[in-house]
Amino acid sequence: LIWVHDYHFLLIAKELRKLKCTQKIGFFLHIPWPSKEILTALPDHRELVDALLDFDLIGFQTRKHVLIFLDYIISELGGSVEPDGSIFALGKKSKVKHFPISIDTNKIIKISEETDNSTQVKRLVKSIKTDKLIVGVDRLDYSKGLELRFSAYNHLLTNHSEHIRSTTLLQIAPTSRGSVFQYKEIRRKLELSAGKINSAYGDFDWTPIRYLNKGFQQKSLMGFFRNSRIGLVTPLRDGMNLVAKEYIASQRVSDPGVLILSRFAGAAEEFPDALIVNPHDPEGV
């Protein structure tokens, strides 16, 4: 059995079949599968999917991604689909299912409970002078929608002044691909945005945005989640998003925080009771 992960190796089954490889080969896509309209904009979209069909099993994060893929198979390739997920197209047979990745929930609960005695978490709680701590934890990546997130928080302070001094946004965003120019630009823009918001609304004893371009240990992050009132998870696109799951698992059962979740994260399919928002709509966020 060969198990292949993510789009970087999407063509590998086709190459292995050329080498007479007869083992079962499975493929799991961690990112969202594009809509038919976007996929067909690629000149070689048929060749791409043809290579994908050389896998015996194709896995996606959500049922929605499976349905989008099957729509392409039927409408563009004239393929057929069986009730068990088997597909027939381009003279090949494969099978498609969704396998949402997750977390070790019991482990996260245990870790978060232990943070009640964490010195670092106590320091955070002591330093927060507001009623509502909002926490965001993301890689510094364009897909996470951090610029729009800061814009939404600025919109909140501008149009709902009662939240000035009553909220604090703690955004943790460790560097991702720091040597790439585009990622350096994201960091520069975020630092500029945070500076403008803090300059406009901050005071000597209150900083609206605490933006930290560094990582923290998992135990510390779970403690930050546990002591916040809002978890802000607003990616522009995300296959699943495990931060959303960690946020929920880390909460106190007696007094949980609220998860604000992008409709474009795969996790939204599993958490309909979260506050589902469009990250492009600052008023909605």
Each PLM stretch: what is its role?
Residues 1-285:
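Catalytic cores of carbohydrate-active enzymes across secretory and cytosolic contexts
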